[in-house]
Amino acid sequence: MIITSLLDTDLYKFSMMQVVLHHFPAAQVEYRYKCRTPGVNLRPYLDEIRAEVHALCQLRFTEEELQYLGSLRFIKSDFVDFLGLFHLPERCISIGEGEQPGEIAITVAGPWLHTILFEIPVLAIVNEVYFRNTRRHPDWDEGRQRLQSKMHLVLDDPALADFRVAEYGTRRRFSKLWHEEIVSTMKAQMGAHFAGTSNVLLAMRHNVLPLGTMGHEYLQACQALGPRLRDSQVFALEVWAKEYRGDLGIALSDVYGMDAFLRDFDMYFCKLFDGARHDSGDPFVWGERLLEHYRNNRVDPRAKTLVFSDSLTFPRAIELARQFAGRCKVSFGIGTNLTNDLGHEPLQIVMKMVRCNGQPVAKVSDAPEKTMCDDPAYLAYLRQVFQLPPA
């Protein structure tokens, strides 16, 4: 089986899940899968995908896994107790044929607390099933050579002594074995340049730092859970701060675009949060705007961290590191370019929350193609409320 541990997912799923347990235990949500890569035929593999998801739903956390989660400073004991009883409910996931030729349809609907852990392993399953059928003889040597070239861009440049990169590629990895090789190789060869991984299982197994804070779904759900739509981003950040009391302090900035984020990210949040994460739009413009915003709020940017994670490559990350050197702390999360770069085109697949408590939710990011919503009227209303230009 592809997924053999419920820890084989990204850390931010657990940090969000703990907030859901403590603040929104009754929330009901719906997620929908989408493949953005044209011309991909996944239908021949439907039965394989269903079998893998069935096996996923039989998994439980082991005692060793629960102890590891409990050792993380921000994970509370009642959450670990809850996870000791947890399994993914198979009745909440539906897998079938999509509307377009070759397309598959995957939806997840049910309690947020019980369905939040579906997304990452399901995407990893779709990826691995597809590639093990279409790339039966992967060019491992090509992949290893590409990885070495990337690492040496950093290792061979003394000016990049402070460069830190994390592996963020669970959902779009070529395979779990290749994923593990990437993490073990980076740990062995990059030393302090390797900040860690978003994958909790690999962090535990290789004794590296698990990394992650919040994802888009958290801020999207707060559109339905907060007091009113206009205040939903502030509400989400305040609930996060109430839960973590200053820990896990990287705010996600692109659910409503940078303009709306800066309007809401006032002096209080500037001081309270450690920094922000970029995930769409021009990263250089975004970084400069954020630094200016900190200065305008009388906060020294040198004490803050800018995290870049949008479709990053090593050359792009190095360029960003040079631009912001000495002006703030920077960190980089590289996903697909690490875990699925063996010389073929990776799949652009996502699984996004589309409803919470019966109402539509959406991300209106700085990259229009990333917007995913099944209700155009709601999307138009969201743009109006957050003073965003029409699509």
Curated annotation (Swiss-Prot):
Which reactions are catalysed by this chain?
nicotinate + 5-phospho-alpha-D-ribose 1-diphosphate + ATP + H2O = nicotinate beta-D-ribonucleotide + ADP + phosphate + diphosphate
> Record's superkingdom?
Bacteria
Write out the entry's keywords from A to Z.
Ligase, Phosphoprotein, Pyridine nucleotide biosynthesis
After translation, the protein is modified as follows: Transiently phosphorylated on a His residue during the reaction cycle. Phosphorylation strongly increases the affinity for substrates and increases the rate of nicotinate D-ribonucleotide production. Dephosphorylation regenerates the low-affinity form of the enzyme, leading to product release.
Q: State any GO CC term.
A: cytosol
* EC number(s) per entry: 6.3.4.21
What's one GO MF term for it?
nicotinate phosphoribosyltransferase activity
Q: Record's SUPFAM superfamilies?
A: Nicotinate/Quinolinate PRTase C-terminal domain-like, Nicotinate/Quinolinate PRTase N-terminal domain-like
Query: Pathway, according to UniProt?
Result: Cofactor biosynthesis; NAD(+) biosynthesis; nicotinate D-ribonucleotide from nicotinate: step 1/1
GO BP, sorted A to Z: NAD biosynthetic process via the salvage pathway
> InterPro entries of this UniProt entry?
N/Namide_PRibTrfase, NAPRTase_N, Nic_PRibTrfase, Nic_PRibTrfase-Fam, Nicotinate_pribotase-like_C
Q: Which family is it part of?
A: Belongs to the NAPRTase family.
Role: Catalyzes the synthesis of beta-nicotinate D-ribonucleotide from nicotinate and 5-phospho-D-ribose 1-phosphate at the expense of ATP.
Know the name of this protein? Answer: Nicotinate phosphoribosyltransferase
